[in-house]
Amino acid sequence: MKIIYAPCVLFCVLLTSGSGAAQSPAARTAERMRELIRVLDLKVLPKESGYLGIVGVSPQKVVVHGKPLAVQSQNYYMLTDTLPINYLHWLEPADTHILIEGGPVDYFIFHPDGQVEKIVLGMNVAKGERPIVAVPGGCWKALQLHKDARYALMANALSPEFTPDRVRIGEGAAWVKRFAGKAEWATPEFLRVMIGPNWKP
């Protein structure tokens, strides 16, 4: 009897393990991440990195530099363990990020007056994390997913709406010199990492 049924037992075990009936937490997280990317139609964002999904713009308008723009534009944005950094960029509009799921994320803000901030975008408010980060217009910023996180899905609202002519991606040596040493984490090496592939010689 043992010889007859052993192959059947082995076959059933293999079927069960391959069917996803007993998925590990890591497998469930990876599946959830893929589901969000698919359902929300997120696409890899060139230069800045991460995944972006356009939601829309508000019907209200405001005039900026002589052009009518929507008061606000809204997007989904995601970082993953394979695309963990939103590389340094400057935005003219104000930008607000709201954590929907996952994280936490380190949020680095560089103000035009030379001040710097590091805010942890996350749900553990008892540890100082914040589920919303609001960045004034005219700042540089970069985001980095925590190493123990698989992904972070965020909503972001830009006011007035985002347009490609009001963003600058990357910086160079003069920018690094300007902000290096403004905080313990703001080393030249780390700032260079946050600029990433968009280094301007």
PLM features per residue range, with description:
Residues 20-22:
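Boundary at the C-terminal end of the N-terminal hydrophobic targeting segment
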